[in-house]
Design a protein with these regions (language model features):
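C-terminal motif of bacterial Sec signal peptides marking the signal peptidase cleavage site
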Residues: 17-18
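Mature N-terminal segment immediately following signal peptide/propeptide cleavage
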Residues: 36-52
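Accessory "access/gating" subregions that flank catalytic or transport cores
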Residues: 32, 165-186, 195-205, 214-219, ...
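Active-site-surrounding "flap" and adjacent substrate/cofactor-binding loops of secreted or lumenal enzymes
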Residues: 57-103, 118-120, 142, 153
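Alpha-helical support elements that line or immediately flank enzyme active sites
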Residues: 48, 52-59, 197-200
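Sec-dependent signal peptide recognition
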Residues: 4-10
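N-terminal leader/propeptide and maturation segments of large enzyme subunits in energy/redox metabolism
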Residues: 98, 102-114, 118, 124-153, ...
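Active-site cavity-forming subdomains of large catalytic enzyme subunits
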Residues: 46, 110-116, 120, 125-230
Length: 323
C-alpha cells in the first residue's frame, strides 16, 4: 500500500478516535478532508524547499561580532534584492556580483535538491512506510540511516546528525546516539529540522505526534534541544486543527500559544519564546527585534543560554536555541 494511501487511512482513523467527551458526555469528532490535507502536505514540502534554498543564499553571511569571526551588522529588509555578501566559508576569489538575495523557485518539472533536514524527514517518511509501522524502532532508524546516507562521500550532514551517524557506523543505536555522554552536539539544531513531519502524520493529535517523534528526536537531541523539537512537532500537528479563525495570523498565533504550553517555564526555550513575543507586541520592527534577541542571548547570555561561553565555531550558530 502506498504511503499516501496509508496517510489517508490514518487520517480517517483519526476521524473515529480523535475525540473528546463534551459536557453532555457526547463525543466531539475531528474530521479532516483527505483532498485538502494532501494539498497541505504538498505545501509543506514545497514551502520547506523554497525556504531552504532561499535561505542558503545568505546562510553564514552574518553571524554577529563575537569571537574570532566577525561579520558586521546583520542584514535588513533594504538588502532584499541586492547583492549577496560573502559567507564565512567562501573564498575571496568567488564572484558574488551576480548573486542576488531573492526567492529561489523551480519549475514544476524540476527536482528540488536538499540537505540533511529535508532529506532525513523524507527518509523517516519512507522508513515508516517500508517497515509498515507508525513507531520506528532503534534498529529501523539505525539501519535506515546506514542504508540511505552516504558514508564516504559528501552527505551534507551537520553537527549532531553527523555525530549520530558516526556513532551508528560504530554500532551504536538510538537513543544512545543522542545522549550527551556520546554526542557532544546534542544541543544543536538538528532534531528540530528533521522531525517536524511526525506532527503532520498525526493531524490534530500532537500527543500521537510526540510518541511517533520521541525516538527520532532522541537520535540527535536532549534537554532543551529536544524540547524545542517537540514544540515544532506540536505546531505541525495543530496546523490541521478544525477551529474557525478570522485570519491565518490568528490561526498561527493560536498554534504557537498552544505549543508554548509544552515548554518548561524554567528553561531557556520558554523564556526565549516569551521574550520574542514581548518584542512583537511592543511594535518594534523585525530588525530591531532580531538585534535584541542577539544581544540578550548571544552577547549577554541571559536566561541560562550560555552557548557563547562554550567558544564553539561561529559562536554556536547551529545551536537549537538561537535558531
Amino acid at each position: 500500500m502506498g504511503f499516501l494511501k496509508k496517510l489517508i487511512l490514518f487520517s480517517l482513523f483519526l476521524f473515529f478516535i480523535a475525540c473528546n467527551k463534551g459536557i453532555n458526555n457526547e463525543f466531539e469528532y475531528i474530521e479532516i478532508s483527505r483532498e485538502n490535507y494532501t494539498n497541505k502536505l504538498h505545501g509543506f514540502w514545497l514551502g520547506q524547499s523554497i525556504a531552504n534554498w532561499t535561505s542558503l543564499i545568505t546562510e553564514m553571511d552574518k553571524i554577529g561580532n563575537i569571537g574570532e569571526i566577525k561579520t558586521g551588522n546583520f542584514y535588513t529588509r533594504d538588502d532584499w534584492g541586492g547583492i549577496d555578501q560573502r559567507s564565512i566559508w567562501e573564498d575571496s576569489l568567488v564572484n558574488k556580483s551576480r548573486v542576488k538575495i531573492d526567492f529561489v523557485l523551480k519549475d514544476e518539472s524540476d527536482i528540488w535538491g536538499s540537505d540533511d533536514d529535508t532529506d532525513i524527514e523524507y527518509m523517516y517518511q519512507y522508513l515508516l512506510n517500508f517497515n509498515d509501522t507508525s513507531i520506528l524502532s532503534p534498529n529501523q532508524i539505525r539501519d535506515g540511516w546506514l542504508k540511505h546516507i552516504k558514508s564516504n562521500e559528501e552527505n551534507y550532514l551537520w553537527e549532531s546528525n553527523q555525530v549520530a551517524f558516526d556513532l551508528m557506523k560504530s554500532g551504536m543505536k538510538p537513543p544512545e546516539t543522542g545522549d550527551p555522554i556520546n554526542n557532544n552536539s546534542y544541543m544543536m539544531i538538528d532534531a528540530q529540522l528533521t522531525t517536524e513531519i511526525f506532527g503532520l502524520l498525526s493531524p490534530s493529535r500532537p500527543d500521537i505526534g510526540l510518541k511517533m517523534a520521541e525516538l527520532p528526536i532522541k537520535t540527535t537531541a536532549r534537554y532543551e534541544a529536544q524540547e524545542i523539537a517537540e514544540f515544532y512537532v506540536i505546531m505541525h500537528s495543530l496546523a490541521s486543527n478544525s477551529k474557525e479563525f478570522n485570519s491565518t495570523k490568528e490561526n498561527i498565533f493560536w498554534i504557537a500559544k498552544e505549543s508554548r504550553e509544552h515548554l518548561n517555564d524554567n528553561n531557556y526555550p520558554a523564556k526565549m519564546y516569551d521574550f520574542t513575543e514581548k518584542l512583537y507586541k511592543s511594535g518594534i520592527n523585525w530588525e530591531n527585534a532580531r538585534d535584541s534577541i542577539y544581544q540578550r542571548y548571544q552577547v549577554d547570555q541571559k536566561d541560562g543560554y550560555n552557548i557563547t561561553s562554550k567558544n564553539l565555531y561561529c559562536n554556536g550558530c547551529f545551536a537549537a536555541g538561537i535558531n
